[in-house]
Amino acid sequence: TYAALAHPSTIAHLKKIGVTSVELLPIHQLISEPHLIKMGLYNYWGYNTINYFAPHHRYASLQAQSDGPQAIMDELKTAIRELHRAGIEVILDVVYNHTAEGGARGLTYSYRGLDSSNYYRQDDAGNYHDTTGCGNSLNFGNSHVVDLVIDSLRYWTNEMQIDGYRFDLATTLARDESNTFDPGHPLLRRIVEDESLSSAKMIAEPWDVGLGGWQ
């Protein structure tokens, strides 16, 4: 749980073994894939995001879950604050390359219901371009999608006090309108130039499953 992450015994152990930063697997609100749910299983890895601003409720203590969204947020903030007090940075693994809604036959949970044609990369016939292997890819040729990610990063940096990010399948985040990787992509430039983000630690997973994916 978030509370356990900042428990004195946890922090004491991290300090004892010389840890100066922790990287958390994705903690954005997520759902399990339908085929896992049918088997009674759960996506423990977390790479199936439906919202980039809310922390996943199931990682909070039962008490916080019972008390509601603000209690979950406060529990996570407390954990980050206590780690910082111990001199330990907090880095988040973030999954901005796709959402949990899957391919064309997937369910509608979030951004697909808001505006599928703008949020997801598609061809002229409306078929999804999938460079993530997860059924869909967010359309970073659309400035609104770039704004979404920048706003999310600012929120987690300024409000939640996160120190850095590891970008899952980062090549997808810098594909232009022709689906080609662009090292000068607007998202990359805005991260570097942003007052809130320019000093954060940034780690990129340098590939996706599209053409020219390894970067």
Regions found by a protein language model. Name each.
Residues I88, L197-A200:
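A short helix->loop->beta-strand "cap" motif at the edges of active sites that frequently abuts
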Residues L188-V192, S199-Q215:
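Polar, glycine-rich mid-to-C-terminal structural blocks
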Residues Y2-Q161, R166-E193:
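Substrate-binding/active-site clefts of carbohydrate-active enzymes
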